[in-house]
């Protein structure tokens, strides 16, 4: 049932093609190097501790997953290391049969022990290892009856198991290397994916080349790929100037127009909804952000509905929504959403109420620093817009923008007042989407520092509820409560616009920029 729901949500996404006409099915060609831009660098190389595209886009081609999402038919789950699987009638056990003869890039064999070691690292990370999604997989126990069989047993019922196992962040590492050093994935690339690691020149490039020992002898088509790390403003000149042919995260409407004005006949455009929102995180360990009225007031000052109309013309920010993607089957209906703090369409009344709430809380003329990434889209416009909205209720915020690693270090340490953060994962499922709204006891990405166990309890309850209608009610209760407490508040959801050179084939856009980035099916028509 969860798969059916996700497919219904994905159906909203539309792909548009602009150029000389849609090509019929082409015969893939081997060879060539795919050059593409990435607008941020990974803070380290560890998939299990990451939430950023800056890691997925360079690193996904180097690793295999147990199973993965099909970019052509999202959210269908297809084999990767697992060639087949069976599900017990009570859905409390999932058994996977691994491909034979799979090798890591160093020539060592990949067996069920490597899958188990990787998932054990996610579920129960050793000291010093960060596992962002450990709460997601807490009910799983991994067993290995033989070298080609992996069994996941559930302690409790769990919704969306196959989709959870298809996470692009669940890279399979070498058990032998993890035993020597559980932290090795942070600084070393050694996977079993279609491309081996060539090199990373910080601030400049990343390169991978075809792995001749890849389990699928017909893949990859490419000889290799090369990434250029650039500022967001350099993507359009980079594509027009021929430095690279693609950027897989997304461009804003103005940039799409610039590209089409200059090179329409050579470009392919994809557009659709995005499983991403920009949100504000209030550090509840610092005053006055420990006061719910202060947090609510700062959310209520922001005109999301007016901002949607204005910002969607110049940025990738567009849709008004709560914790769940607007239009998704489990999200709060708009009629309910507008009753919650920060989502009313009467912005004048909201701002007057917000001023009174701040004064009552002793926070009149509040001043603080807004911590943000130095990535133009959509962080800069989102930060600037929020600061302008707060100014209208007498609040002054200083915009502090940092390089991604420095930003993430500060947020992880709780060294901020308010932060511009994102909520994004590889699918719509609430178990994924609520990860940053939890306490740190349950999720390392609970950056607000709140200790509200009610959210954690509701989270666990929905995760263990198989009945869709019952689960939807729990999710909506959790969403109402989270938005009212306002530890984190969504600003706007994103629109995804991809503009690539039309010679790139085999790449398909999904609602998540984390998916379909292993490049195994990509080829160049040249």
Regions found by a protein language model. Give the residues of each.
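Structural transition elements
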Residues: 318-360, 377-379
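Gly/Pro-rich hinge or "lid" segments in bacterial periplasmic/extracellular proteins
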Residues: 68-72, 166-220, 224, 233-234, ...
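Long beta-strand-rich cores associated with HINT superfamily self-processing modules
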Residues: 498-526
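Surface-exposed binding/hinge segments that line
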Residues: 97, 131-177
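Extracytoplasmic/peripheral linker and loop segments enriched in polar/acidic and small residues
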Residues: 347, 396-407, 432-502, 526
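N-terminal lobe/hinge region of extracytoplasmic solute-binding protein
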Residues: 37-89, 120, 188-192
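Ligand-site clamp/hinge motif
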Residues: 213-258, 296, 387-388, 396-398
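Ligand/substrate-recognition segments at binding pockets and active sites
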Residues: 202-203, 253, 347, 351-426, ...
């Amino acid at each position: 049932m969860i798969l059916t729901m996700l497919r219904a949500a994905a159906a909203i996404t539309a792909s548009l093609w602009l150029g000389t006409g849609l090509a019929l099915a082409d015969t893939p060609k081997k060879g060539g190097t795919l050059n593409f831009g990435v607008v941020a660098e990974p803070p380290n190389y560890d998939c299990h501790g990451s939430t950023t595209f800056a890691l997925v886009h360079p690193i996904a081609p180097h690793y295999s997953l147990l199973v993965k999402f099909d970019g052509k038919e999202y959210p269908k789950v297809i084999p990767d290391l697992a060639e087949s699987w069976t599900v017990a009638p009570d859905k409390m056990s999932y058994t996977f049969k691994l491909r034979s003869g799979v090798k890591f890039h160093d020539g060592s064999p990949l067996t069920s022990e490597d899958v188990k070691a990787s998932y054990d690292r996610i579920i129960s990370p050793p000291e010093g290892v960060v596992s962002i999604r450990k709460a997601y997989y807490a009910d799983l126990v991994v067993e290995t009856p033989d070298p080609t069989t992996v069994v996941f047993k559930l302690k409790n019922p769990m919704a969306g198991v196959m989709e959870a196992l298809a996470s692009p962040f669940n890279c399979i590492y070498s058990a032998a290397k993890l035993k020597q050093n559980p932290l090795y994935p942070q600084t070393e690339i050694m996977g079993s994916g279609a491309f081996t690691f060539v090199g990373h020149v910080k601030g400049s490039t990343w390169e991978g080349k075809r792995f001749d020992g890849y389990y699928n002898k017909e893949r990859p088509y490419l000889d290799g790929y090369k990434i250029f790390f650039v500022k967001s403003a350099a993507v359009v000149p980079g594509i027009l100037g021929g430095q690279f042919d693609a950027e897989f995260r997304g461009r804003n409407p103005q940039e799409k127009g610039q590209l089409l004005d200059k090179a329409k006949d050579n470009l392919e455009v994809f557009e659709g909804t995005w499983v991403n929102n920009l949100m504000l995180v209030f550090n509840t360990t610092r005053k006055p952000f420990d006061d719910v009225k202060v947090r609510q007031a700062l959310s209520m000052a922001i005109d999301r509905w007016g901002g949607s109309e204005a910002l969607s013309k110049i940025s990738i920010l567009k849709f008004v929504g709560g914790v769940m993607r607007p239009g998704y089957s489990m999200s709060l209906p708009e009629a309910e959403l507008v009753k919650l703090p920060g989502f009313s369409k009467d912005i004048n009344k909201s701002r007057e109420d917000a001023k009174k709430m701040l004064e009552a809380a002793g926070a009149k003329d509040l001043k603080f620093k807004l911590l943000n990434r130095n990535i133009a889209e959509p962080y800069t416009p989102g930060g600037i817009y929020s600061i302008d909205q707060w100014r209208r209720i007498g609040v002054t915020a200083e915009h502090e923008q940092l390089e991604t690693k420095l930003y993430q270090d500060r947020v992880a340490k709780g060294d901020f007042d308010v932060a511009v953060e994102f909520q994004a994962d590889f699918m719509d499922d609430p178990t994924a989407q609520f990860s940053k709204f939890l306490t740190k006891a349950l999720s390392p990405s609970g950056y607000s520092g709140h200790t509200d166990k009610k959210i954690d309890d509701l989270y666990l309850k929905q995760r263990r509820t198989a009945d869709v209608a019952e689960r939807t009610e729990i999710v909506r209760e959790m969403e109402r409560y989270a938005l009212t407490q306002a530890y984190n508040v969504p600003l706007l959801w994103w629109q995804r616009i991809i503009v690539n050179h039309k010679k790139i084939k085999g790449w398909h856009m999904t609602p998540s920029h984390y998916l379909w980035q292993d490049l195994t099916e990509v080829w160049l028509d040249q």
